[in-house]
Curated annotation (Swiss-Prot):
Complex and partners: Homodimer.
Disulfide bond sites: none
Taxonomic path: Bacteria, Pseudomonadati, Pseudomonadota, Alphaproteobacteria, Sphingomonadales
N6-(pyridoxal phosphate)lysine PTM positions: K221
Presence of the UniProt keyword Cytoplasm in the record: no
InterPro entries xref list: Aminotrans_II_pyridoxalP_BS (IPR001917), Aminotransferase_I/II_large (IPR004839), HisP_aminotrans (IPR005861), HistidinolP_aminotransfase (IPR050106), PyrdxlP-dep_Trfase (IPR015424), PyrdxlP-dep_Trfase_major (IPR015421), PyrdxlP-dep_Trfase_small (IPR015422)
Name of the molecule in the record: Histidinol-phosphate aminotransferase
NCBIfam families the record matches: hisC
Listed EC numbers: 2.6.1.9
Similarity field: Belongs to the class-II pyridoxal-phosphate-dependent aminotransferase family. Histidinol-phosphate aminotransferase subfamily.
Protein source organism: Erythrobacter litoralis (strain HTCC2594)
Gene3D superfamilies found in the cross-reference section: Aspartate Aminotransferase, domain 1 (3.90.1150.10), Type I PLP-dependent aspartate aminotransferase-like (Major domain) (3.40.640.10)
GO biological process, one term: L-histidine biosynthetic process
Alphabetized GO MF terms: histidinol-phosphate transaminase activity; pyridoxal phosphate binding
Length: 367
């Protein structure tokens, strides 16, 4: 008997649903959540004050987020007319693929990159194509070699999630220069606020000067506003027009716009966040590197997390269980081809000391 139900499109059937970071253990116990790359310092006091301010939830938000776009343009030296806001940068990444790729097209990204890129490609019926990494970092030569006449979108996260790797300005420029002009280059800068000004990868300048570059950012990481779901992108006017055509008309809430506006106005908080992250990331990766004789290897990271590889007698699953017993949820990544890796968000100094100690004890026990 034939199936008469509405049939899901074949390319949608190929999607593996995004799996968010966990906050509970196997028995349902609450854990300290270091699995989603949230800010351990919370958000700016100014943003919190904006969230607490009375408002009218019966009214629709500004559909164009004009005040927020103007403030972003002021802080980053951009043209507000070349900025669009979204429900997190995830929405904008998906819409970029939807607007510029479809069945018969290819969407290109590195093997160990943000899992949303694969989903974004499949959602619009395009074919996801993975270029091999070089020791868990994006390889410009491999990406360029994977470009075909079917390539329509290239996604690069910089810094990269889940590995923390980073392509410097000259490599980003080389990648862009090697792409055909009719290929959209999406530079996902979700973790850019964790970089120093000297580490700027030149994305904004590329987006301002070229017709095929879109840069996305988010308020979910350094700004500590993950619960409000706010992202933004900048690029050529025809990109902004395309994204405005396909996005929801009221896609950023009143509270989200107010909190983001206040957060952008408090760059001192971003500086404190960066300083905390740099200090604790360095301490933690040093502690993990000291366990190299146990086959434990932290990858270099410019983000707010460390990807720790377990290549010796201590398995990642065993370390994951030990950390849960110690009260922590971190991200195990077998679904992204990293069954031997744990992505660990940088938390407080106390958190990182306890995690390092737990892993060291588990490594000794596994000998």
């Amino acid at each position: 008997m034939s199936d008469t139900r509405p049939q899901i499109k074949t390319w949608i059937e190929g999607i593996h649903a995004y799996v968010p970071g966990k906050a509970t253990g196997a028995q349902g116990q609450a854990l300290i959540k270091l699995s989603a790359n949230e800010n351990p310092l919370g958000c700016s006091p100014k943003a919190l004050e904006a969230l607490d301010a009375p408002g009218n939830p019966a009214t629709y938000p500004d559909p164009d987020a004009k005040a927020l776009r103007a403030k972003l343009a002021e802080v980053h030296g951009l043209d507000a007319g070349r900025i669009v806001c979204g429900t997190g940068s995830d929405e904008l990444l998906n819409l970029a693929a939807q607007a510029f790729a479809g069945p018969g097209d290819e969407v290109l990204f590195s093997t160990y990159s943000f899992s949303v890129y694969d989903i974004a490609a499949r959602r619009c019926g395009a074919t996801p194509v993975e270029a091999p990494d070089a020791d868990y970092a994006a390889d410009v030569d491999a990406l360029l070699a994977a470009v075909t006449d079917k390539t329509r979108v290239v996604f690069v996260a910089n810094p990269n999630n889940p590995t923390g790797s980073f392509l410097p300005r000259d490599e980003i420029a080389r990648l862009h220069a090697g792409l055909p002009q009719d290929v959209l280059f999406v530079l996902d800068q979700a973790y850019a606020e964790y970089l120093t000004p000297e580490e700027d990868d030149g994305g904004f300048a590329l987006a301002a000067a070229h017709e095929n570059v879109l840069v996305t950012r988010t308020f979910s990481k350094a700004y500590g506003l993950a619960g409000e779901r706010i992202g933004w992108a900048t690029g050529a006017p025809h990109f902004i027009d395309a994204l405005n055509r396909v996005r929801g008309p009221f896609n950023v809430t009143n509270s989200g716009q107010a909190a983001a506006l206040a957060g952008v106005d408090d760059q001192n908080f971003i500086d404190r966040t960066r300083d905390h992250n740099t200090r604790e990331l360095t301490r933690f990766t040093d502690a993990m590197a000291a366990l190299g004789n146990h086959g434990i290897r932290p990858l270099p990271s410019k983000a707010n997390f460390a990807l720790v590889l377990f290549e010796g007698t201590l398995a990642a699953e065993t370390a994951l269980s030990a950390l849960a017993d110690a009260g922590y949820a971190v991200r195990h990544l077998p679904g992204q081809g990293l069954p031997h890796g744990l992505r660990i968000t940088i938390g407080t100094a106390e958190d990182m000391d306890r995690i390092a100690r737990t892993i060291a004890e588990a490594a000794e026990a596994a000998q």
